[in-house]
């Protein structure tokens, strides 16, 4: 006689197969959970490493930008000492022009200023302008004229690449 399906399901072999299936299922679940945990940890690690990489990359890029700016500034101001050494020569030419209005000296001065301007040197306009403490140094005052204005320029000042190389020595109107 053949066992009924309910009897067949209760045979020791069937029971053992069912238990084995359940054990395997639990093992697979544990393996799956372990793999899931390792995957999650790997994603976290990748995320942390990516963040660290991006921070380091940004830091290197900022460092490069800073160094590029420093090199640019060094290039711009490399001639500063040389141009400062030329200022007394320009002062002497200006003094000679004041003493005798020699057109040849004026041309030489203008030519020299033209050459030096290619390296960033520019004279500061002082006479008739409003006093600016960043551009002008007061060496005297007068009451003749509009208050706060530069009346006379005693010594010309110069800028180098938008920075002041030497301030103009001026006489200012003060009432």
UniProtKB/Swiss-Prot annotation:
Biological processes per GO annotation: protein folding
One GO CC annotation: cytoplasm
Molecular-function GO term, any one: protein-folding chaperone binding
Where does the record locate the signal sequence feature?
none
Keywords for this protein: Chaperone, Cytoplasm, Stress response
The organism's place on the tree of life at top rank: Archaea
Where can this protein be found?
Cytoplasm
Subunit details: Homodimer.
Q: Known HAMAP family for this protein? A: GrpE
Xref: PANTHER family: GRPE PROTEIN, GRPE PROTEIN HOMOLOG, MITOCHONDRIAL
Q: What does this protein do?
A: Participates actively in the response to hyperosmotic and heat shock by preventing the aggregation of stress-denatured proteins, in association with DnaK and GrpE. It is the nucleotide exchange factor for DnaK and may function as a thermosensor. Unfolded proteins bind initially to DnaJ; upon interaction with the DnaJ-bound protein, DnaK hydrolyzes its bound ATP, resulting in the formation of a stable complex. GrpE releases ADP from DnaK; ATP binding to DnaK triggers the release of the substrate protein, thus completing the reaction cycle.
In which family does this protein belong, per the annotation? Belongs to the GrpE family.
Query: What name does the UniProt record give this protein?
Result: Protein GrpE
Q: Which organism is it from?
A: Thermoplasma acidophilum (strain ATCC 25905 / DSM 1728 / JCM 9062 / NBRC 15155 / AMRC-C165)
Q: What is the lineage of its organism?
A: Archaea, Methanobacteriati, Thermoplasmatota, Thermoplasmata, Thermoplasmatales
Its gene name is grpE
């Amino acid at each position: 006689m053949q066992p009924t399906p309910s009897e067949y399901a209760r045979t020791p072999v069937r029971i053992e197969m069912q238990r084995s299936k359940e054990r395997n299922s639990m093992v697979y679940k544990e393996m799956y959970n372990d793999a899931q945990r390792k995957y999650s940890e790997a994603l976290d690690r990748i995320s942390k490493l990516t963040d660290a990489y991006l921070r380091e990359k940004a830091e290197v890029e900022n460092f490069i930008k800073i160094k590029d700016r420093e090199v640019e500034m060094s290039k711009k101001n490399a001639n500063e000492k040389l141009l400062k050494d030329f200022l007394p020569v320009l002062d002497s030419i200006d003094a000679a022009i004041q003493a005798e209005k020699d057109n040849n000296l004026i041309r030489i001065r203008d030519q020299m200023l033209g050459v030096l301007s290619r390296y960033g040197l520019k004279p500061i306009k002082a006479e008739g302008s409003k006093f600016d403490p960043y551009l002008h140094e007061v060496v005297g005052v007068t009451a003749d004229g509009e208050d706060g204005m530069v009346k006379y320029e005693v010594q010309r000042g110069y800028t180098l690449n938008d920075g002041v190389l030497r301030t103009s020595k001026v006489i200012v109107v003060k009432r």
